[in-house]
């Protein structure tokens, strides 16, 4: 028999396309028929975070990232908004963390819960919607396999891993290592499970030029490590302290998709009487802050006035 098989090598390669190859196809019909206001994969905001997407939340050491994370996951697990950032429904959330023991977690949970005035029914709901795990040993492939089992077992919508440093298991400044970990090892888990993945991360020392604060795009790359981190994630959030105030004040900037939120930057401060993050108006100066300002020194005179 003659004229059997492919006419050319290119035709042969085309015929060998796998199901995985076909799953990457997006047709013009798909694009035209997509309804962004009714996306079944939407989880939070106006398609801000979707199923299978990712976010990195970066901030300095000792500024309260753990309590911030606690407040976020409690609100979203209850189906409530975090300063205007609202989930489409109560989300099933899992947290894996390495830096706090059970007592630390309990203090943060109880403190934030008291600050948010959670009710008995809220607590009952959280028992179903929110899970915590402490894992301080596994890194790299072993950690990802552990997280994958957790996602499947608990049918998670969102998983938070805190911090990235503890679980990467390599050199975060090595772009090759970071790319393989995020794109070749973690991303398939997100595609398989459709979970939204949030890393908590440490920020490198902020570099300011000419006394000016960093721009949003500069903040996006402020997390310690390779720029591949910012390239990979759907959203980058950076918590940075502003000024010297009591209570301490911060800006939470959403650097990549903040335009999908009510506000791309949220002005936050530590609660004055409880463990809770509160929003403040940066244009309002209180009487106490005015008293803290140094009085004008009228003894200091210019040389040419003597």
What do these predicted ranges mean?
Residues 1-21:
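Short, small/acidic-rich helices and loops at N termini and domain boundaries
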Residues 16-114:
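The Walker A/P-loop phosphate-binding site
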Residues 35-42, 141, 217-220:
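Short gly/ser/thr-rich secondary-structure transition/capping motifs
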Residues 45, 61, 88-180, 273:
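Conserved inter-motif catalytic segment of the P-loop NTP-binding fold
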Residues 52, 91, 154-155, 193, ...:
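Structured loop/turn residues at beta-strand edges in well-structured enzyme cores
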Residues 56-57, 62, 66-67, 179-282:
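Phosphate-binding/switch region of NTP-binding enzymes
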Residues 78, 152, 190-191:
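Residue-level signal for alpha-helix termini/capping positions
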Residues 155, 276-306:
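DNA transaction DNA-binding modules
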